[in-house]
């Protein structure tokens, strides 16, 4: 079993810099309250750090 992260968009990307909008798009987040489950790796953690004020994150156990 591998660790995964459930990431939910909590605030809108309207009026945010294009780098932040691109980061959200790269994670698959487009609408408020949309959630995605991604693997827990350093790349995803870095993306979360860039937009931490817009998203919420929690760890979930996943089976691949």
From Swiss-Prot:
<dbReference type="InterPro" id="IPR036919">
    <property type="entry name" value="Ribo_uL30_ferredoxin-like_sf"/>
</dbReference>
<dbReference type="GO" id="GO:0003735">
    <property type="term" value="F:structural constituent of ribosome"/>
</dbReference>
<dbReference type="Pfam" id="PF00327">
    <property type="entry name" value="Ribosomal_L30"/>
</dbReference>
<dbReference type="GO" id="GO:0022625">
    <property type="term" value="C:cytosolic large ribosomal subunit"/>
</dbReference>
<comment type="similarity">
    <text>Belongs to the universal ribosomal protein uL30 family.</text>
</comment>
<dbReference type="InterPro" id="IPR005996">
    <property type="entry name" value="Ribosomal_uL30_bac-type"/>
</dbReference>
<protein>
    <recommendedName>
        <fullName>Large ribosomal subunit protein uL30</fullName>
    </recommendedName>
</protein>
<dbReference type="GO" id="GO:0006412">
    <property type="term" value="P:translation"/>
</dbReference>
<dbReference type="InterPro" id="IPR016082">
    <property type="entry name" value="Ribosomal_uL30_ferredoxin-like"/>
</dbReference>
<keyword id="KW-0689">Ribosomal protein</keyword>
<keyword id="KW-0687">Ribonucleoprotein</keyword>
<comment type="subunit">
    <text>Part of the 50S ribosomal subunit.</text>
</comment>
């Amino acid at each position: 079993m591998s660790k995964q992260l459930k990431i939910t968009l909590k605030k809108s990307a309207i009026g945010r810099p294009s780098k932040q909008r691109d980061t959200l798009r790269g994670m698959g987040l487009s609408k408020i309250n949309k959630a995605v489950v991604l693997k827990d790796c350093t790349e995803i953690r870095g993306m979360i750090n860039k937009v931490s004020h817009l998203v919420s994150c929690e760890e979930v156990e996943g089976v691949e």
